[in-house]
């Protein structure tokens, strides 16, 4: 029994060192975990607000009209949330090796949460792909900083906006 406790404490310390969770005064305060049904309202709210702000070049009605559909699809997707003090502050959605999107609450953007979510997924996948609107300059710079490379350009037929297809590959063979 004592060995189990020591082993579990050791594993938690390794996870903390990897930046997946943090300890403050002996308490776990933030973590990345799989989406739960009880998270849907918080996550869909972040999805809508982030899209409205980041994609100002797309009519608001486009995002608002897709809100309910996204709420229905979230439980069927591979989604990981970043939670701090029981509040979801961001999430990443995937379909196989394709990143559907990284979304961080407006008030906490540029605090490293998007990077933590992306690093978490990079540790699980050997390669990743995503599409990003060409007018979303901050997102493009973020992905390039994270070693994503523009592979091609295409038109998003739903919005009429040009987008880049970007790829990332791990340096390590899995």
Walk through the language-model features, giving the residues of each.
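Conserved GNAT-fold acetyl-CoA-binding loop/helix
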Residues: 45-71
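Conserved acetyl-CoA-binding loop of GNAT-fold acetyltransferases
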Residues: 144-154
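Conserved beta-hairpin
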Residues: 78-90
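A short beta-loop-alpha structural element at the N-terminal edge
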Residues: 31-45
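A short helix-loop-beta-strand connector motif used in the catalytic cores of GNAT acetyltransferases and
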Residues: 69-81, 98
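Conserved GNAT acetyl-CoA-binding A-motif
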Residues: 123-135
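A short, internal acetyl-CoA/4′-phosphopantetheine-binding micro-motif in the GNAT/acyltransferase core
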Residues: 98-109, 132-133
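Conserved acetyl-CoA-binding loop-helix of GNAT-fold acetyltransferases
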Residues: 110-123, 141, 145
